[in-house]
């Protein structure tokens, strides 16, 4: 149950995003709050499994920022990506099944397109995932996503976050090597 977390959410300060009529938490480092420790543990367990089993990588991802989104009736969240992040995520609180889903869109459009006889999540340009209580969705940070207008009476509340690796990225052989610690040492 997310009762304690929901109580804490009601004590937070919010900033209105005028262009979308939605709100985000003023604090963007929410995983440092004691009240979110269970969610933090769940996020890190999920990130570790995702990195190991899906990305098949030994990279260690850490959450760099974490904030709440509140979409009251009539608000939406414009299409966007998350720069300076590898994997992003969204965790859902107290979701009415009637609330708008998250919408993902292909970031790369094809020069040629075959006309499918029937669309599915594998051949569509856009696909929707419903919001479910206590669910965590992880996705590549450069994947375009948005939230349609909330037509329901209840606000749609979600926690979003970005990640980055604390390890060296890429390889010297493929000319994609990125070692922040080495770069910092060379320039200090």
For each of these PLM feature ranges, what is it?
Residues 68-138, 148, 165-177:
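Catalytic core of non-heme Fe(II) oxygenases with the double-stranded beta-helix
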Residues 61-69:
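A short glycine-rich, His/Asp/Glu-containing loop-to-beta-strand
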Residues 58-60, 81-85, 151-155:
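A generic structural micro-feature
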Residues 1-59, 76, 155-158, 162-188:
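Non-heme Fe(II)/2-oxoglutarate
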Residues 63, 124, 154-158:
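Short edge beta-strand segments in beta-sheet-rich domains
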Residues 144, 148-158:
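Ligand-binding loop in jelly-roll beta-barrel domains
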């Amino acid at each position: 149950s997310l009762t304690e977390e929901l109580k804490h959410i009601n004590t937070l300060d919010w900033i209105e995003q005028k262009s979308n009529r939605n709100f985000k938490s003023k604090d963007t480092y929410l995983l440092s709050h004691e009240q979110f420790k269970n969610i933090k543990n769940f996020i890190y367990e999920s990130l570790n499994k995702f990195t190991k089993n899906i990305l098949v990588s030994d990279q260690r991802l850490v959450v760099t920022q974490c904030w709440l989104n509140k979409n009251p009736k009539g608000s939406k969240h414009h299409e966007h990506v998350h720069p300076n992040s590898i994997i992003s995520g969204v965790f859902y609180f107290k979701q009415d099944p009637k609330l708008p889903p998250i919408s993902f869109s292909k970031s790369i459009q094809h020069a040629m397109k075959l006309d499918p006889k029937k669309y599915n999540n594998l051949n569509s340009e856009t696909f929707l995932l419903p919001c479910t209580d206590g669910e965590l969705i992880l996705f590549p940070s450069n994947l375009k996503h948005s939230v349609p207008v909330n037509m329901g009476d209840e606000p749609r509340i979600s926690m979003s976050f970005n990640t980055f690796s604390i390890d060296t990225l890429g390889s010297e052989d493929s000319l994609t090597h990125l070692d922040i610690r080495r770069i910092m040492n060379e320039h200090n």
